[in-house]
């Protein structure tokens, strides 16, 4: 099912679900690295993303994973816009953490910059989807 969503417009319901799936897959495959990059991003940003993400200090990825799993299984009973905004906040922090990571070197710089850009794009699309969902127009 997720592969059908991959071509959907970013601010459609299938497109938003695809982006949630991507965030979930990335967290599942790189839990510790994602936690470190998230915390590095939170340390660098002067935003409320950690609060919006609903993340304790340090980040507990299990809570976000459960929300994303519930949304993707259709078992989520909460506010979809809030879930989208939380995932966007996580993505923004990981994006920032990828650029500011303390051990960055020339060999890793290109990959981390690309990863940061990808997370930034996903964050923006999820935020836009959250706004669209709040307006009742996410379809």
Annotate the PLM regions.
Residues 3-67:
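Long, charge-patterned amphipathic interaction tracts in eukaryotic proteins
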Residues 4-5, 79, 111:
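Non-transmembrane, amphipathic alpha-helical segments
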Residues 2-3, 83:
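Solenoid-repeat scaffolds in large eukaryotic assemblies
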Residues 96-139:
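Alpha-helical oligomerization segments
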Residues 44-108:
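Conserved binding-pocket/active-site segment within a compact domain
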Residues 8-13, 27-34, 74-82, 94-101, ...:
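Short secondary-structure junctions and interdomain/linker hinges
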């Amino acid at each position: 099912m997720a592969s059908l969503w991959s071509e959907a417009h970013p601010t459609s319901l299938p497109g938003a679900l695809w982006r949630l799936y991507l965030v979930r897959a990335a967290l599942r495959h790189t839990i510790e690295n994602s936690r470190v990059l998230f915390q590095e991003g939170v340390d660098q940003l002067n935003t409320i993303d950690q609060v919006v993400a609903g993340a304790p200090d340090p980040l507990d990825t299990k809570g976000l994973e459960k929300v994303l799993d519930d949304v993707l299984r259709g078992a989520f009973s909460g506010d979809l816009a809030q879930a989208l905004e939380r995932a966007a906040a996580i993505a923004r922090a990981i994006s920032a953490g990828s650029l500011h990571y303390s051990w960055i070197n020339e060999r890793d710089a290109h990959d981390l910059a690309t990863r940061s850009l990808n997370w930034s794009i996903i964050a923006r699309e999820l935020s836009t989807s959250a706004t669209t969902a709040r307006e009742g127009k996410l379809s």
